[in-house]
Amino acid sequence: MASSSNYNTYMQYLNPPPYADHGANQLIPADQLSNQQGITPNYVGDLNLDDQFKGNVCHAFTLEAIIDISAYNEPTVKGVPAWLPLGIMSNFEYPLAHTVAALLTGSYTITQFTHNGQKFVRVNRLGTGIPAHPLRMLREGNQAFIQNMVIPRNFSTNQFTYNLTNLVLSVQKLPDDAWRPSKDKLIGNTMHPAVSIHPNLPPIVLPTVKKQAYRQHKNPNNGPLLAISGILHQLRVEKVPEKTSLFRISLPADMFSVKEGMMKKRGENSPVVYFQAPENFPLNGFNNRQVVLAYANPTLSAV
C-alpha cells in the first residue's frame, strides 16, 4: 500500500536495527567483533577506469564471501557462499576509482548476531570511514544483512561462528540504458517514488511519473505514489543476463518521464531501472509490494 506522508518508512532502510548503534564514520574495533583477522578482498568485474570520467556510468558493488560455519557440538560446514550487496552508484555520486580503491584496500571481518529473534550477518570493514560516501559499507564501516537472504543454506537453529576464508569484490557495470536521477536531483533533497522489495534492501527508486498520470487523483500529495501503485501489476522483473544478482524493470514509456534521468536516449525506449537482489528473487511482478518515497542518495536524511 502506498504511503505519501510517512517519511519514516524510508528511515527504516537508512537506520535499520543491526547498525543503528553505530553512527557515521564510527568503525567498531576489531577485537569487539571477532577473534579472526581481517581479510582483504580479491577483485572481479567490469572495471574500466576510463569510466570514472563519465558521469552517466553506474556500477553495482557486491562482496562475495566464502565462510566456514561452526557451532557447538556440530561439525564445521566449510565453503559456504554468502552474497553481500553493497549498492548501486554512479560517478555523479562518487568517483569510481576512489570507491574501488577504498573497497579493495579495506580489511573485512564477518560476524553473526541476533536482533529481535532474527539472525543477521554483519560485515565489518576495518579502518577509516568516508562520512559522505553513498555506499554504507564505506560510509559507516559495517553493514548487516538478514542471514537467510545472503546465505543460501538454512542455519537457523543454532548460534554459529563464522570464519571468513575468501572475499571477492564484484563490480558490475550497468548497461547504458540504466536510469538514474540526474545530478541535480541526486545531490539535492528531492524524493522519488520507490518500490520496497525487501525489509533489508533499499527501495528501488523509480523515475518521476508523468504529470498526466496523477492528474486523475484528487490529492496531489498522494499523486505520484498512487500512480505507481496503480500500475505495479504491469511491472515485470527480468534477470540481467551474465550478471550476478542484478535485475531490471522496464517501465511503461507512457507513464514515466525520462527527461531528468541519466540514461542514453535510444529512440522511444522505456526507462529501465536496475537493482540488486538475491539470485532466487521472484520474477512474477510487484503486486503487494509497498510503495514509498525515497531519496536517490542514501546518505541523505528524511525531513
Swiss-Prot record:
InterPro entries: EV_matrix (IPR008986), EV_matrix_protein_N (IPR043079), EV_matrix_sf (IPR038057)
Molecular functions per Gene Ontology: structural constituent of virion
GO biological process: symbiont-mediated suppression of host innate immune response; symbiont-mediated suppression of host JAK-STAT cascade via inhibition of JAK1 activity; symbiont-mediated suppression of host type I interferon-mediated signaling pathway; viral budding via host ESCRT complex
Keyword flag Iron: no
Any GO CC annotation of this UniProt entry: virion membrane
Principal place of residence: virion
Keyword annotations of the record: Host cell membrane, Host endosome, Host membrane, Host-virus interaction, Inhibition of host innate immune response by virus, Inhibition of host interferon signaling pathway by virus, Inhibition of host JAK1 by virus, Interferon antiviral system evasion, Membrane, Viral budding, Viral budding via the host ESCRT complexes, Viral immunoevasion, Viral matrix protein, Viral release from host cell, Virion
Membrane topology, from the record: Peripheral membrane protein
Motif PPXY motif: where in chain: 16-19
Compartment(s) where it occurs, according to its Swiss-Prot or TrEMBL record: Virion membrane; Host late endosome membrane; Host cell membrane; Host endomembrane system
Function as written in the Swiss-Prot or TrEMBL entry: Plays an essential role virus particle assembly and budding. Promotes virus assembly and budding by interacting with host proteins of the multivesicular body pathway. The interaction with host E3 ubiquitin ligase SMURF2 facilitates virus budding. The interaction with the nucleocapsid and the plasma membrane may also facilitate virus budding. Specific interactions with membrane-associated GP and VP24 during the budding process may also occur. May play a role in genome replication.
Note: Most abundant protein in the virion.
Domain notes: Late-budding domains (L domains) are short sequence motifs essential for viral particle budding. They recruit proteins of the host ESCRT machinery (Endosomal Sorting Complex Required for Transport) or ESCRT-associated proteins. VP40 contains one L domain: a PPXY motif which potentially interacts with the WW domain 3 of NEDD4 E3 ubiquitin ligase and the three WW domains of SMURF2 E3 ubiquitin ligase.
Membership in a protein family: Belongs to the filoviridae matrix protein VP40 family.
Self-association and partners: Exists as a dimer until it reorganizes at the plasma membrane into multimeric form. Interacts with host TSG101. Interacts (via PPXY motif) with SMURF2 (via WW domains); the interaction positively regulates virus budding.
Name by which UniProt lists this protein: Matrix protein VP40
Gene for this chain: VP40
